[in-house]
C-alpha cells in the first residue's frame, strides 16, 4: 500500500484548518498511519527543504516552517500520492482549482497551508525524515473492503 507525507504548515494550524484538512483525506478513504504536532527545528527544516538549498527562497522556506507549530502526517492508500496532490491543489493558491485545499483556503504562494510529497521516492524520504518506524501504526479501518477491490 502506498504512503505519502503531508504537513499542515504554520498558517494552516494558526487558521484552524487542521480538522478540515484531515477530514478531506479521511472522507476520500485514505488511512492515517502517523500523526504528530510539533515545532519544527531549523535542522529538520533545512533537511526537509534541502533540494532548494541553493534557491534564493530557501531561507524564507526555513523561516516560515519554523515560525509556528506544524501537523506532520503519514497517509496510506491506493494512489495516495497522486490523489493527495489533487486534493491539495496547485502550489500557488491563486491558480489552484476551487474545491482543493489551496484553492479554497490558500492566500498566496508563501502561505499555501500544506506540503505533500510529489513522488514515491520523495514520500519515502520524507516519511523517514519526519517519523521513525515505531511512530507509524499499521492498521486497517473496517471500511477498507468497501473502498478497495
Curated annotation (Swiss-Prot):
The keyword rRNA processing does not apply. SMART domains: NDK (SM00562). The keyword Cytoplasm applies. Pfam families: NDK. Belongs to the NDK family. It is found in: Cytoplasm. ATP binds at residues 9, 57, 85, 91, 102, 112. One of its GO terms (biological process) is GTP biosynthetic process. Its main location: cytoplasm. It is an enzyme of class 2 (transferase). Its cofactor is Mg(2+). It comes from Nostoc sp. (strain PCC 7120 / SAG 25.82 / UTEX 2576). The active site is at 115 (pros-phosphohistidine intermediate). Gene3D superfamilies: Nucleoside diphosphate kinase-like domain. Its EC number is 2.7.4.6. Keywords: ATP-binding, Cytoplasm, Kinase, Magnesium, Metal-binding, Nucleotide metabolism, Nucleotide-binding, Phosphoprotein, Transferase. Major role in the synthesis of nucleoside triphosphates other than ATP. The ATP gamma phosphate is transferred to the NDP beta phosphate via a ping-pong mechanism, using a phosphorylated active-site intermediate. It catalyses: a 2'-deoxyribonucleoside 5'-diphosphate + ATP = a 2'-deoxyribonucleoside 5'-triphosphate + ADP; a ribonucleoside 5'-diphosphate + ATP = a ribonucleoside 5'-triphosphate + ADP. Homotetramer. It comes from the Bacteria. GO terms for molecular function: ATP binding; metal ion binding; nucleoside diphosphate kinase activity. GO terms for cellular component: cytoplasm. This is Nucleoside diphosphate kinase.
